[in-house]
UniProtKB/Swiss-Prot annotation:
PANTHER family according to UniProt: MICROTUBULE-ASSOCIATED PROTEINS 1A/1B LIGHT CHAIN 3-RELATED (PTHR10969)
GO CC term (a single one): autophagosome membrane
InterPro entries: Atg8-like (IPR004241), Ubiquitin-like_domsf (IPR029071)
Keywords tagged on the record: Autophagy, Cytoplasmic vesicle, Lipoprotein, Membrane, Protein transport, Transport, Ubl conjugation pathway, Vacuole
Name of the protein in question: Autophagy-related protein 8
Membrane topology recorded in Swiss-Prot or TrEMBL: Lipid-anchor
Main localization, broad class: membrane
Site features described as Cleavage, chain residue numbers: 116-117
Family of the protein in this entry: Belongs to the ATG8 family.
Subunit field text: Interacts with ATG4,. Interacts with acetylated ATG3.
Residues carrying lipid (Phosphatidylethanolamine amidated glycine): 116
Amino acid sequence: MRSKFKDEHPFEKRKAEAERIRQKYTDRIPVICEKVEKSDIATIDKKKYLVPADLTVGQFVYVIRKRIKLSPEKAIFIFVQDTLPPTAALMSSIYELHKDEDGFLYITYSGENTFGDLFEEVE
């Protein structure tokens, strides 16, 4: 999925910003969180987050749910490079595995599992 944030900000500017953030806040991870384009779920009010390194994916999902005021009975899925990350994984480990070359971790969210059942292991 194409990132609007990437489209709106040149690579060098994004990279410099991510480096500045990582130097100033060594225990935080710069995250860009955007809605999957065709999803009918609410659009988030801000895209850029400074996430504590020890936060789990599940805790981050909780933050997103609150920001978009999603009712408890509604589903939300988050994706990192079109894959569902494990809920118990630390954001720091997801960052190390999937950070973009500009230094940000890009996460998308949707009200439906738009990429299918990607958490199965492929043999």
